[in-house]
């Protein structure tokens, strides 16, 4: 597996469990069994890693929702299933993640909001 992907997947796991602010790049390197220097070869800083995690996470949800849309019986069923999927995502998310994004990672939060707005517009039409 590509190290960039491996790092992003581990970051998402740790961020969802502990919140973004609570997980340092040093913690990340330890969890991955690599040095901080190696970690910084793949991501320039934590902000870049956070943005990548948000991008990957929202892309996974988008693809899942597109699949749900294809399998839904009708438009009402589609909306119900998609909202159920999105709510499941929020239930499984540490509440600190969105707070940390908004307060400490504005670019990541902006990306999340853009996704949310595009997502809603796309699936409501």
Predicted regions mapped to residue ranges:
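Short, flexible helix-adjacent loops and helix caps
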Residues: 19-20, 66, 70, 95-101
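Positions in alpha-helical segments
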Residues: 37, 63-66, 107-110, 114
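N-terminal intrinsically disordered/low-complexity leader segments
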Residues: 1-2
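Short secondary-structure transition hinges
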Residues: 88-125
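Hydrophobic alpha-helical connector segments
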Residues: 52, 56, 66-92
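Helix-turn-helix
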Residues: 6, 10, 14-48, 52
């Amino acid at each position: 597996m590509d190290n960039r992907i491996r790092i992003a997947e581990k970051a998402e796991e740790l961020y969802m469990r502990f919140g973004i602010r609570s997980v340092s790049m040093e913690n990340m390197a330890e969890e991955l069994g690599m040095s901080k220097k190696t970690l910084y070869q793949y991501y320039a800083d934590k902000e870049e890693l956070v943005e990548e995690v948000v991008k990957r996470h929202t892309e996974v949800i988008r693809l899942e929702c597109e699949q749900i849309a294809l399998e839904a019986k009708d438009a009402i069923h589609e909306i119900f299933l998609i909202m159920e999927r999105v709510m499941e995502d929020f239930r499984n998310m540490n509440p600190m993640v969105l707070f940390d994004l908004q307060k400490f990672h504005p670019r990541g939060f902006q990306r999340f909001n853009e996704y949310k707005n595009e997502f809603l517009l796309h699936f409501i039409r």
